[in-house]
């Protein structure tokens, strides 16, 4: 599920959670994605507002330079599938927040989507929730054996590192700061695990 919105920046309405007396910078915790730079600033700005209306931020990505696209990936807090209405609510909130703070000086496009089944692993809770499933991981810092691209079974994570069992049987601990990206591999087991259970009669 995805929607797009284009904006030229600036806006008159300050969201209630950014009124005077509310902090405009929030620390990243184990339930929020870890970002740096402009993506980190945007994550700090929008995550509290999303949480206040029942959503969780999964990832912020900025693509392009001339007219950048701000990609927001989110979940519902209750873990039910994200709908088009949800994407629209998220889009309106994010646009209002970014128009107030104006972290991007030029025109930009907003893209809001669900994480999908083969989702990125960006938070400690993602690594723990999907323990037992296969993931592909790209590293900025190689492992002791010199590898920067791994495929293995997720074993879980804490605030410092994620643990993965490789196909060779070796278990490795990967500091979050060394992980460039990590994403679940689409398998039958993952599809079954993420199927929405039938509604009770």
Swiss-Prot record:
Q: Which UniProt keywords apply?
A: Cytoplasm, Ribosome biogenesis
Please give the biological process terms from Gene Ontology that the record holds: ribosomal small subunit assembly; translation
**Where does the signal peptide begin and end?**
none
Which Gene Ontology CC terms are recorded?
cytosol
UniProt-listed Gene3D superfamilies: RimP-like superfamily, N-terminal
Q: Has keyword Cytoplasm?
A: yes
**Out of the domains of life, which is the source?**
Bacteria
Question: Where does the record say this protein resides?
Answer: Cytoplasm
Q: Does the UniProt entry include the keyword Oxidoreductase?
A: no
Q: Tell me, in a sentence or two, what this protein's role is.
A: Required for maturation of 30S ribosomal subunits.
* Protein family membership: Belongs to the RimP family.
List the protein's name. Ribosome maturation factor RimP
